[in-house]
From Swiss-Prot:
Boundaries of every RNase H type-1 domain copy: 1-141
Pfam families cross-referenced by the UniProt entry: RNase_H
NCBIfam families assigned: PRK00203.1 (NF001236)
Cofactors named for this entry: Mg(2+)
Gene: rnhA
GO cellular component annotations of the record: cytoplasm
Source organism: Herminiimonas arsenicoxydans
UniProt protein name: Ribonuclease H
Gene3D superfamilies, per database record: Ribonuclease H-like superfamily/Ribonuclease H (3.30.420.10)
Subunit-structure text: Monomer.
Annotated GO MF terms: magnesium ion binding; nucleic acid binding; RNA-DNA hybrid ribonuclease activity
Cofactor remark: Binds 1 Mg(2+) ion per subunit. May bind a second metal ion at a regulatory site, or after substrate binding.
Length: 146
């Protein structure tokens, strides 16, 4: 199974507002950069979108290490999602899970891979995270500001 490091980030100008997501996929000496943007979104949605797009870009099952500066993503996929699914996508307080569409998409995207989820401190000089941040900001720039 191919081993891949994925660095992801989301950005938002206003929350909600124009948002962007970015992902850097590193496979040995090879790299692939992905980014995109959406109007009227949130930082959490863009963080999720970055991981979903990165995993969906993989053409076959892989051993993946996902590096994210989003505790929302890291804890959500590693800890909270099991309870949400058991409760029919409701929180412990029985409220609907926010961003359920993206959580379900991420759950499906991760299913065919072996994934280790790593949280990294954002804006702390971590090269992969800084590159993902720059890609997310490029994603914001693709969205018209009208």
């Amino acid at each position: 199974m191919e081993k891949i490091d994925i660095f992801t980030d989301g950005a938002c100008k206003g929350n909600p507002g124009r948002g962007g997501w970015g992902a850097l996929l590193v496979m040995g000496e090879r790299e692939k950069e992905l980014f995109g943007g959406e109007p009227g979104t949130t930082n959490n949605r863009m963080e999720l979108k970055a991981v979903i797009e990165a995993l969906n870009a993989l053409t076959r099952p892989c051993e993946v290490i996902v590096h994210t500066d989003s505790q929302y993503v890291q804890k959500g996929i590693s800890e909270w999602i099991h309870g949400w699914k058991a409760r029919g996508w409701k929180t412990a307080a029985r409220a609907p899970v926010k961003n359920v569409d993206l959580w379900q998409a991420l759950d499906a995207a991760q299913a065919r891979h072996q994934i280790e989820w790593r949280w990294v401190r954002g804006h702390n000089g971590h090269v992969g995270n800084e590159r993902a941040d720059a890609l997310a900001n490029r994603g914001v720039e693709t969205v018209n500001s009208n």
